[in-house]
A protein has these predicted regions:
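Active-site-proximal alpha-helical
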Residues: 82-196
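Catalytic cores of extracellular degradative/oxidative enzymes
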Residues: 1-127
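Beta/coil-rich, acidic/histidine-enriched accessory regions frequently appended to metallopeptidases
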Residues: 156-255
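Polar/charged alpha-helical tracts
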Residues: 4, 14, 18, 90, ...
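Residue-identity detector for glycine
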Residues: 8-9, 36, 43-48, 65, ...
Length: 255
């Protein structure tokens, strides 16, 4: 690639061509990660290098008919987590056990960036409430942005009177038609003002969800409770349990 080369808009790239044989869409993770950045999606604090992977899951599932678990697995090329595996990956951390939010320090200890547990909450919303719930949410975000009335944009307090994280939980809940607070809390994003958020949820007529309750009970049942179960999970996401890597993340964290 030569940045000084004049292409007149005709730069040849593999993803612009009808390749023969066609490139397997399951291996487009990096391209869709960068395309995700280009969408300028807002997210919870710390999701910047996480949520951008998620639209690829929608494309694989809706466009190519890939089942939800496989579609989610293929959203990154360096790991092999289903949503259930991502839940386990989060539940076996000290932060989860101690009731803390997911680490978003942008250090090697960060538990969001480039990791499927960092955006699995959206996969759960899609699995429990359908893709339309997320389509409703992001469509409204786009409409509001274009109209210059985005609920939260570089403001500590949003137009709905809630702080940013709480407002996003509230808006996602409205799009899904149910109170998503417990689900999002499970995934390590805690309300800043739970009282104000609960009042907004109630005022909007959003109820507690039995399917969320059932999902959280299910997650409690798959959390490893001993070393053998931990190693079974390790083998699932990193076959062969390789003994290398940085101790703060990836395969090295498991060692």
């Amino acid at each position: 690639y030569n940045p000084l080369e004049e292409t007149n808009g005709n730069q040849v790239a593999w993803f612009l061509l009808n390749q023969t044989p066609p490139r397997n869409p399951l291996f487009w993770a990096t391209e869709f990660h960068e395309l995700g950045h280009a969408q300028l999606m807002q997210g919870f604090w710390g999701e910047g290098e996480a949520i951008v992977n998620f639209p690829f899951s929608y494309v694989l599932n809706e466009k190519f008919g890939v089942d939800n678990d496989t579609a989610f697995q293929k959203t990154v090329s360096h790991a092999n987590y289903t949503v259930d595996d991502a839940a386990i990956h989060w539940m076996i951390t000290e932060n989860f056990r101690n009731g803390n939010p997911m680490d978003n320090s942008n250090t090697t200890l960060d538990e969001f960036r480039y990791q499927q547990r960092g955006y699995a909450k959206y996969a759960d919303i899609a699995r429990l409430f359908g893709w339309q719930a997320l389509k409703n949410f992001f469509y409204q975000e786009n409409v509001d942005f274009n109209a210059g009335t985005l609920t939260c944009f570089e403001e500590a307090v949003c137009r709905d009177g809630l702080v940013q994280a709480d407002s996003r939980i509230f808006r996602l809940s409205k799009a899904a038609g149910a109170d998503l607070t417990p689900l999002i809390h499970f995934w390590g994003v805690h309300p800043d003002n739970s009282t104000a958020l609960a009042q907004a949820i109630t005022a909007a007529g959003l109820d507690n969800s039995t399917i969320i309750r059932d999902k959280l009970v299910y997650y409690a049942g798959i959390a490893p409770t001993n070393n053998a179960q931990f190693n079974t999970h390790f083998e699932t996401v990193f076959p062969g349990r390789p003994a290398y890597g940085h101790p703060d993340y990836g395969v090295g964290w498991y060692n």
